[in-house]
Amino acid sequence: MRKVLVLMMALIMFVNMFGLKVIMVTDAGGLGDKSFNDGTWAGVQMAVEQLPDIEAEILISKEQTDYVPNLTNAAQNGDVVIGVGFMMADVLFNIAMQYPDTFFIGIDIEPSPNQVIPSNLALYTFKEEEGGFLLGYLAASMTKTNKVGFIGGLEIPPVKRYEIGYRSGVEAFNQIKGENVTVITGYVGSFTDSSKTKQIALSHYDHGADIIFTGVTTAAVIDAAKEVGSSFYGLPDNAPLNQIIEEYFEKGRGYFVIGYDMDQDYIAPGYVLTSSRKKVDVAAFEGIRSALYDRNFNSGHHVLGIEDEGMGISPMKYTKGMVPNEVIAELVFLQKLMKDGEVDIPQNEAELGSFDVNSINIPF
């Protein structure tokens, strides 16, 4: 046994002598998106800081035509290649098969039905519907107009799961509380068209929604929320948080946006109610760790949700004082039910149509 342990330690030391060069290829949003590109890069930086002998580089994709040259460049010059975003799925699969001696990690990338995943490719996706469910329940609990909004970029699976989950949360609230909160939905057709995103957000607010969950450029929806909200409160755009909170309680209502994929509450304190949290940083770190230490790469499709803390919502650092304690307690209770497998969140329209939570008894 001692000889085996010595051999294992020697192997790890041998591997660490050479380390790994990790090259991340962004989606078209690039760094600074305050979303999954930034989150994945944070996971890479965490690996650089916490794991031995990791060198990191990043290649920025400005548009989808950059995927092939960037991923090819990364495969030729790196030991581990991380591709970010659903839109580069086909390219990542093709490049991974061309470079079998390189490890590939796909973040927010899932295989097609019956698609064989190469042994050098690890895919990480998330149960966005679970985070969306909690956000929908919170929005329905907080709305003063009985209307909430959802804005997506492109109708791709991760965004649709967010939408379905969000609407499921609203439906759960309606069934449990006997209310009739409705959801206004809209899609931009792009993840980068800030002007159209803001236009849709203003339209949602104009049609009565007072809370919007955005699965697209959050900054544009925040601009809309601040524009409408500051006018309603009679405050300047740069009003401090304490004044926003005072006016919220004075007026008895306000205008909010819900961020996505990362904790975006800090971007506009008092206007960002909360954010979904997709642990893309953890996925990137675990993929790199697997390549470094195991050399038995943990390939395949890994789906992370609330049960394994891959999804969640932000702690509402700036707005928790606006949210009744009863609502906070209900969110914690519902999250526990999901962790325990006692409630399954719909992933598509058919499942949403038959969604029934009347059996859920909130014990307070």
Predicted regions and their residues:
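Sec-dependent N-terminal signal peptides
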Residues: 4-13, 17
